[in-house]
């Protein structure tokens, strides 16, 4: 298992991180294990108590259990926990999202405590969900933690800026090349680079799954490597394993939509995965884009329909 990352996320002095198992489980997407570890560990200081709770509640968010976070984080809770609550409010209420973003804009225009890594991560997450990657990147660049850099890498790759993602990864490697987050970011960059790097990415995902747990994040990473190499049947096996773990996981369903098309499966198979995705994640960016394409197609059909 990788040693703990130095810096704000782990105390920064190179000593053994008492919250390493909590963080590591969260980073690889093993959210229930993260919750279990967080409830088991006894932190040595009030500051570490807050840090543990941050990961505990972020794991609940990842499980879409927004009510737990909203019920348990009080107005008197630490600023780091208030940031997690802000993200929970955003995720839980479609109708309040614009107001939450407007309030966040006002907060970002004032002096921001850049040592509050959790606030930077939650603010960047809100901006990214709100389809404002530029604001997300500006927010993350104010922090110097490995987690801020890892999220920066993810966003840059989604923007097809592999060149900038490589530079950010180099900064992570300089800080701690063995950290779990650095290894994951290395796999993401290798996957985006393609070619011979695909096998490197696959080995990272596979090794983490073997050492820790074959989580949905790691299984989808393996499947993406298989698909990029044209190994569709191998990808199907991995994605079925992921589907068995969670039949409503959005990335798994999206990958199965792509896979079904390439394997020439009947249209109803693809439509079934799309329907599951629409039911469970109607505001997912993929679904929003898919519906926009459907509307564009309908307009074109009307435009070229023969007049009576």
Swiss-Prot record:
InterPro entries: Coatomer_esu, TPR-like_helical_dom_sf. GO terms for cellular component: COPI vesicle coat; Golgi membrane; nucleoplasm. Keywords: Cytoplasm, Cytoplasmic vesicle, ER-Golgi transport, Golgi apparatus, Membrane, Phosphoprotein, Protein transport, Transport, Ubl conjugation. It is a peripheral membrane protein. GO terms for molecular function: structural molecule activity. It is found in: Cytoplasm; Golgi apparatus membrane; Cytoplasmic vesicle, COPI-coated vesicle membrane. The keyword Magnesium does not apply. Its main location: cytoplasm. The modification Phosphoserine is found at residues 13, 45. It comes from the Eukaryota. Pfam families: Coatomer_E. GO terms for biological process: endoplasmic reticulum to Golgi vesicle-mediated transport; intra-Golgi vesicle-mediated transport; protein localization to axon; protein transport; retrograde vesicle-mediated transport, Golgi to endoplasmic reticulum. Polyubiquitinated by RCHY1 in the presence of androgen, leading to proteasomal degradation. Oligomeric complex that consists of at least the alpha, beta, beta', gamma, delta, epsilon and zeta subunits. Belongs to the COPE family. PANTHER family: COATOMER SUBUNIT EPSILON (PTHR10805:SF0). The coatomer is a cytosolic protein complex that binds to dilysine motifs and reversibly associates with Golgi non-clathrin-coated vesicles, which further mediate biosynthetic protein transport from the ER, via the Golgi up to the trans Golgi network. The coatomer complex is required for budding from Golgi membranes, and is essential for the retrograde Golgi-to-ER transport of dilysine-tagged proteins. This is Coatomer subunit epsilon. It comes from Bos taurus. The gene is COPE.
